[in-house]
């Protein structure tokens, strides 16, 4: 009985196996509130979306807490597709707020600190000077989701430093 030969299945030598390629990161020129909150969920940030109920402004804003530090995200531009947003926190200053803002702005180039006056009671007789810290995040040139996540992670570090700095607990020599 003649032997049957079984051809072996081998890949031809001229075929190259291509490594798996990742999809190119999606470039975003705008974000919706849903996309922002999806990123906040991923970063496990506590937040609440609120609407400004004033007559001239119906834009949403997001109140957040990250590492026990409160801040706001204020979308800017024509909604629902926002081309930029503002990260903002407000802190009391234990020392001279004007001098502290100058020192902070010389040290941290990532954001800006400035003073503001608020009224502390209903009669508007008592005023308190507070410090606001802001960072504008523009998307108009196109950014990736990873860039936005990194921006929030850097903002968290700034929040912690700012809180310590303006409350006199940060050792700048360390």
Predicted feature residues:
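Charge-rich, low-complexity N-terminal segments
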Residues: 1-74, 115
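Hydrophobic residues embedded in beta-strands of well-ordered beta-sheets
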Residues: 60-62, 80, 129-131
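Short, internal acidic amphipathic alpha-helical interface segments
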Residues: 83-130
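Charged/polar positions within long, soluble alpha-helices
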Residues: 113, 160, 164-167
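Well-ordered alpha/beta subsegment
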Residues: 119-153, 164-174
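Long, continuous compositionally biased terminal/linker segments
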Residues: 64-96
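A short, terminal or domain-edge coil/loop segment
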Residues: 32-42, 99-118, 169-174
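Long, contiguous binding/interaction regions
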Residues: 157
């Amino acid at each position: 009985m003649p032997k049957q030969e079984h051809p072996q299945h081998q890949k031809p030598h001229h075929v190259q196996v291509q490594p798996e390629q990742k999809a190119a990161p999606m470039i975003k020129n705008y974000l919706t509130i849903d996309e922002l909150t999806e990123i906040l969920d991923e970063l496990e940030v506590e937040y609440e979306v609120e609407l400004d109920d004033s007559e001239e402004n119906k834009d949403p804003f997001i109140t957040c807490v990250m590492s026990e530090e409160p801040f706001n995200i204020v979308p800017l531009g024509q909604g629902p597709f926002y081309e930029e947003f503002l990260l903002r926190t407000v802190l009391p200053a234990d020392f001279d707020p004007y001098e502290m803002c100058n020192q902070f702005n010389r040290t941290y180039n990532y954001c800006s600190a400035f003073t503001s006056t608020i009224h502390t009671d209903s009669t508007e007789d008592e005023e308190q000077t507070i410090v606001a810290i802001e960072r504008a995040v523009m998307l108009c040139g196109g950014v990736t989701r990873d860039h936005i996540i990194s921006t929030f992670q850097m903002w968290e570090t700034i929040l912690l430093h700012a809180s310590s700095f303006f409350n006199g607990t940060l050792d700048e020599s360390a």
